[in-house]
Amino acid sequence: NIFIIDDTISRNIALGVPDDLVDHAMLINSIKQSKLAVLIKQMPEGVNTLLGESGIQLSGGQRQRIALARAFYHNREILVMDEATSALDTETESEIVNEIKLLKGNKTLIVIAHRLSTVKHCDYIYKIDKGKIVKKGNYESVIGED
């Protein structure tokens, strides 16, 4: 579940940052990275559009992209992405995975995914079956054998 407050797109992305301290360049960049720009242009108030309680007016994929924009905006050293693209179409997922690849070498990413395309860029993969690690290594050694 993605935590969305009953507030604007901007405040949901920069969650926890006082309005006067929001870095608008970082906000715009995180919107671009999460592929939200087209959606936001269609919204009546742009980044100032109210999302409603729990983002009720958004699809699952749109809520995921708000969460990704938040992760990109806050620029943490470690990002945990648990099925972060599961509700996205394959084209949008591919675009976002390309953005995530750009973080390689600068961030520690822990990616939990069922779609193999999501983890293809990872340095190290753990394959878990019934709660146990059954394989580990790079993409080719873990997935290539299946």
Give names to the regions the model predicted:
Residues 10-53, 97-98, 106, 135, ...:
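ABC ATPase nucleotide-binding domain helical subdomain, centered on the C-loop/LSGGQ "ABC signature"
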Residues 68, 112:
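Hydrophobic anchor residue at the start of the ABC signature
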Residues 73-77, 106:
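A short, proline-enriched helix->beta-strand linker immediately N-terminal to the Walker B motif
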Residues 79-83:
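Catalytic Walker B motif of ABC-type/P-loop ATPase nucleotide-binding domains
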Residues 90-91:
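Helix N-cap at the start of a conserved alpha-helix in ABC-type nucleotide-binding domains
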Residues 98, 115, 120-146:
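C-terminal portion of ABC ATPase nucleotide-binding domains
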Residues 102-111, 119:
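Conserved catalytic loops of ABC-family nucleotide-binding domains
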